[in-house]
Amino acid sequence: MKRLAALMAAALACCTVAHAASSYPAPAEGDYVIRNFKFASGETLPELHMHYRTLGTIHKNHGHVDNAVLVMHGTGGDGAQFLRDIFAGELFGAGQPLDATKYFIILIDDIGHGKTSKPSDGLHAKFPHYAYADMILAEHDVIAKKLAVDHLRLVMGTSMGGMHTWLWGETYPDMMDALMPLASLPVQISGRNRMMRKMMIDSIRTDPEWKNGDYAQPPHGLVGALNILLVMGSSPLQWQKEAPTRDSADKFLDDRIARYMKEDDANDLLYQIDSSRDYDPQSKLSAIKAPLLAVNSADDQINPPELGILEREIKNVSHGRAFIIPISDATHGHGTHTWAAVWKDQLVKLMSETERKK
């Protein structure tokens, strides 16, 4: 599975996005092996290989790291997605909000994603059934044990990474100065969001070609799952602009499904979608200590603002506030979370408000 977040952004952007590597330090890639990792399900993996990327250099103040920034990807994503121009080109360059010559930026491929251990590596449906709690623990191990980072200037994430941001604030409340979840809600996944996820899971599992995860060729049920995935993250405004006729709309869809079928793995997608089953931060929101800014967009069909959930729940976060980005030609539905130009002014404000006095 290439990535839910990038799949959405690519489908919405409908353009080739270049890396802005020349404007910030080159990322360094690394791996960390966690031995005998025990999952919340009770399953164990002898070696959990965690892949990560970092930009910049660690800085310490009185023996403690004071410039680390954790950025977490969405369902099906990886850390590399944040190196695209629409994100890194707006944030990581000199003088930009997360200037990589000033901050130490951490981009981790979560369990089941990117170059980190996942079902398609060989275990297929015998891979441990990981959940968000496992992913948070593994992220923390990479940061604390491999990178020796004891404090985070900022924790932020998009979509699933946004949900992880809420969980980080609850699980490690004294470890960060600020939190910025994007395109997420701090409640159990339910309603239409859960129904769409179940549709994707059922589309794969009920396909005889899936063969309980031991398929040789991609099961056709993956097509149904990808169709739902595309609609979940779509922007009616952007898609109408890109495909204003019947023929262009058909080609738009056919081209993307054909490409994703070559790139994606059914088991990986199945596990990625199912991993949200334990997400339920609502009852512990009061445990969050750091200032938190939750950013969603008005055209996000996964987290539609008319539900009023974010506005209701943010009141339970001591230093929390919410910002809803209005629909415009610059928003891209759920995928707005990766278009940093749309919301980076809010990030600048958060960083300014939480800057420690020297």
Segments predicted by a language model, with ranges:
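Conserved acidic catalytic loop of the alpha/beta-hydrolase fold
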Residues: A133-R153
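Catalytic active-site module of serine/aspartate enzymes centered on a nucleophile-bearing elbow/loop
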Residues: V317-K358
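Conserved hydrolase catalytic core segment
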Residues: D150-N193
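Conserved alpha/beta-hydrolase "acid-adjacent" motif
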Residues: Q301-I309
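Short beta-strand/loop motif that positions the catalytic acidic residue
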Residues: I288, A294-N296
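Active-site nucleophile elbow and catalytic-triad environment of alpha/beta-hydrolase enzymes
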Residues: D268-K284
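Alpha/beta-hydrolase-fold enzymes
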Residues: M175-R259
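N-terminal cap/lid subdomain of alpha/beta-hydrolase-fold enzymes
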Residues: R53-D121
